Amino acid sequence: MDNSFQLDQVIENQTFSGNMLAKEYEACEFNYCNFEGIDLVSIQFINCSFMGCNLTNCKVKNTAFKEVSFTDCKILGVNFSVCNPFLLELVFTRCTLDLCSFYKLKLKGIVINNCSLKNVDFVEANLQDAVFENCDFYGSAFERTNLERADLTTSRNFSLDPELNIIKK
């Protein structure tokens, strides 16, 4: 694959390894691709979608996710707290995000629908105006987390200490 820039591509049923990835993807669709354990360091994804992909244990240091959606993806153990925070915009639908970290990330207005978020680190994250629809937060950590106007009404298994978090309607 070209190692520089991919625009408006549909990439399907690909198993990635080593240096197979371009440095930047814009308006690309990844369908049923396997990125398990892949180093995505410093890659830019702009206005991209991932459908049915496996991103378990990917390394995302300085990776840019700008207007990126994930649907029906398996994303276990990914440390999103080290990705590039500039213009970070993520949407997750029907994904498994267990054991991920969003530590200290600014995710104002993030939308997460019908996802498993077990044992996820949200410590010191800014989740103002976030929408968590029908999500399972079993064992997830919220401490010094900004949850102003966040909607968790249809979600379950979360424990929020109002003394340790910012919670306002």
Give, region by region, the residue ranges found by the protein language model:
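Tandem repeat scaffolds
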Residues: 1-169
